[in-house]
């Protein structure tokens, strides 16, 4: 077994490989009472060497340039320093972009003033403060699962003939200027400040998205007073920076209503996801955000296909089809839906949008990059025209039917091989015989049932979490009073598996 020495002792290949999280790298970056750090300075040095080896395999260039950035996490500065030091030691030229966003790091490979061979972002998205991670981009796009496997399994260090050159640069300003130019070009108003007269509040959740107020919205003329949590703070003291989190969405809702804003914008930590709140306080995330963006792309590209992840509403499918489009449900995971969209385009099926209910959204016109700020830019392009026509954002999805009841339950799997347990449960629920439960054949992830009487009218999906030891149950119903009966039947079924922790379920059905 290959071992390596470092400041913090020996690192085994197996330990490095355990940091792989599909097409990302994630780990514990800070010791806590419950966890011991495994994404350490030593680990990051090994990973940096792996990135260099991966690039050398792909690019076969005498000189490589890599851009490096981080979000607001407490461990970010130290890990960034280690990453940069190892890259320079290997002879790679490095742009240190400091605080940045994940989409901006990819764009550093496209902007001519940088032309990076790769962009490397230190982030763990919305996970707790003690996590961190690494996302890697080449000029072709985000690293795939097999690329990360190669990086983590090829960490042999090579000293460059000469040390690389380090340059500090302001990437976010370049990135923001690019967004501003696109919004101006596409806006209904032929003016430098098409958002004059609009009040737009931003909630950055103390992540990296605060730049959007000053460098994008204010430049376009918007009033951003009332924006909150713009200062980067890796303790995340106000709420989880996650547009898929109810507490976070309540926070931006309150800000919109309190400040009488025309729009509220919320980003996750590294700005690859976003959501909006309308003037009336309505939340546009999950199915509603997919519907808004679907209407936009279908107005620009009639008949296009739209790839989503699996836990989307039946009503969303009907909405997209009513606009002349086609929804393709696929496996959760932003790389999965993006790759499915790329596959469809290669097959000659025009597919303009790949999007998850979590807020990851990637447009064909924007390199199929999941970019939360670009999503907001697409919406901002519409605001002046909607105002001129006396319409609201909500009007874009007035025809989208909303379920009367929804519920999500996450069951912790307390088994060493939790994936095997989850797979077994999903395989065995196929044989369940309950009147009103019918397996939906149009599904690629977990198992999806259509519900009819005596269980109302709706659906539920049972699937494994992509990143955590969780079994996720999502239910929608168009009739009131049927969520609990479904949950009770699910409880009876899961009682056969003692390693499934049902503590999140019990309060939902107690005394009902």
For the regions a language model picked out, list residue spans one by one.
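An N-terminal, well-structured beta->alpha segment
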Residues: 6-83, 89-90, 165-200
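N-terminal small/polar loop signature for handling phosphorylated ligands or for N-terminal nucleophile
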Residues: 53, 65-131, 215-277
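Short glycine-rich phosphate-binding loop at a beta-alpha junction
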Residues: 61-71, 95, 199-201, 304-310, ...
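Proline/glycine-rich low-complexity loops and linkers
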Residues: 97-98, 102, 152-183, 193, ...
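Gly/Ser/Thr-enriched, mixed-charge loops and adjacent short helices
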Residues: 113, 130-256
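A short, gly/pro- and small-residue-rich
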Residues: 129-153, 277-293, 366-377
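Phosphate-binding and adjacent anionic-ligand microenvironments
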Residues: 301-474, 479-512
């Amino acid at each position: 077994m290959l071992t390596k020495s470092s400041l913090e002792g020996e690192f085994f290949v197996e330990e490095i490989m355990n940091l792989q999280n599909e097409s990302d790298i994630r780990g514990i970056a800070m010791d806590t009472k419950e966890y011991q750090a495994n994404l350490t300075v030593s680990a990051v040095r090994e990973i940096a060497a792996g990135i260099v080896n991966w690039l050398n395999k792909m690019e076969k260039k005498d000189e490589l340039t890599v851009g490096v950035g981080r979000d607001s996490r407490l461990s970010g500065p130290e890990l960034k320093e280690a990453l940069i030091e190892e890259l320079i030691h290997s002879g790679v030229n490095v742009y240190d972009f400091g605080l940045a966003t994940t989409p901006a790091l990819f764009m550093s490979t496209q902007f001519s003033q940088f032309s990076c061979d790769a962009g490397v972002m230190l982030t763990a998205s919305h996970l707790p403060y003690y996590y961190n991670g690494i996302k890697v981009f080449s000029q072709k796009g985000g690293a795939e699962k097999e690329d990360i496997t190669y990086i983590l399994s090829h960490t042999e260090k090579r000293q460059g003939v000469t040390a690389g050159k380090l340059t500090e640069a302001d990437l976010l300003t370049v990135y923001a200027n690019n967004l501003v130019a696109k919004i101006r070009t596409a806006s209904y108003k032929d003016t430098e400040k098409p958002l004059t007269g609009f009040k737009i509040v931003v909630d950055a959740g103390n992540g990296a998205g605060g730049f959007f107020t000053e460098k994008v919205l204010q430049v376009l003329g918007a009033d951003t007073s009332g924006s909150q949590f713009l200062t980067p703070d890796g303790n995340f003291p106000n709420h989880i920076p996650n547009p898929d989190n109810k507490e976070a969405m309540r926070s931006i809702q309150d800000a919109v209503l309190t400040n009488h804003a025309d729009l509220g914008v919320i980003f996750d930590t590294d700005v690859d996801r976003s959501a909006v709140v309308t003037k009336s306080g309505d939340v546009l995330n999950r199915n509603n955000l997919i519907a808004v963006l679907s209407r936009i792309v279908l107005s620009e590209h009639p008949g296009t296909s739209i790839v989503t992840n699996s836990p989307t509403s039946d009503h969303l499918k009907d909405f997209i089809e009513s606009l002349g489009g086609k929804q393709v449900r696929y496996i959760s995971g932003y790389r999965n839906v993006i790759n499915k969209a790329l596959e469809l385009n290669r097959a000659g099926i025009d597919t303009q949008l790949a999007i998850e209910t979590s807020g990851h959204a990637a447009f064909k016109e924007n390199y199929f990059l999941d970019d939360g700020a670009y999503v907001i830019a697409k919406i901002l392009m519409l605001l002046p025209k909607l105002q001129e026509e006396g319409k609201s954002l909500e009007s874009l999805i007035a025809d989208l039917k909303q379920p009367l009841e929804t519920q999500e339950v996450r069951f912790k799997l307390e088994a060493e091989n939790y994936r095997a347990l989850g797979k077994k449960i999903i395989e065995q629920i196929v044989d369940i015989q309950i009147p009103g439960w019918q397996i939906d054949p149009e599904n690629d992830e977990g198992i999806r049932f259509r519900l009819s009487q005596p269980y109302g009218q709706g659906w539920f999906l049972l699937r494994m979490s992509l990143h955590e030891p969780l079994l996720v149950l999502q239910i929608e119903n168009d009739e009131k009073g049927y969520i609990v009966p479904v949950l009770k039947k699910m409880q009876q079924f899961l009682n056969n598996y003692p390693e499934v922790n049902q503590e999140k379920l019990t309060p939902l059905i107690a005394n009902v």
